[in-house]
Structure formats: C-alpha cells, structure tokens
Amino acid sequence: IECEVCMKPGDRCNGSMMT
C-alpha cells in the first residue's frame, strides 16, 4: 500500500513513520 499523504511527522508512509 502506497502512502497518499505523509507530510506531517508521525504519518504512516509504507509502514514507516515519515519524519
């Protein structure tokens, strides 16, 4: 599953947290 919105820290992107 690809992440749609991961701009804010803590958002889950591909199972990883976007910092």
Curated annotation (Swiss-Prot):
Location (main, coarse): secreted
UniProt KW keywords: Disulfide bond, Glycoprotein, Phospholipase A2 inhibitor, Secreted
Gene Ontology cellular component annotations, sorted alphabetically: extracellular region
Glycosylation sites: N14
Disulfide linkage: C6-C13
Subcellular location: Secreted
Reported tissue expression: Expressed by the liver.
GO molecular function: phospholipase A2 inhibitor activity
Function: Inhibits the enzymatic activity of phospholipase A2 (PLA2).
Family statement drawn from the similarity comment of this UniProt entry: Belongs to the CNF-like-inhibitor family.
Quaternary state and interactors: Multimer.
Protein name (database record): Phospholipase A2 inhibitor gamma subunit B1
Source organism per UniProt: Crotalus durissus terrificus
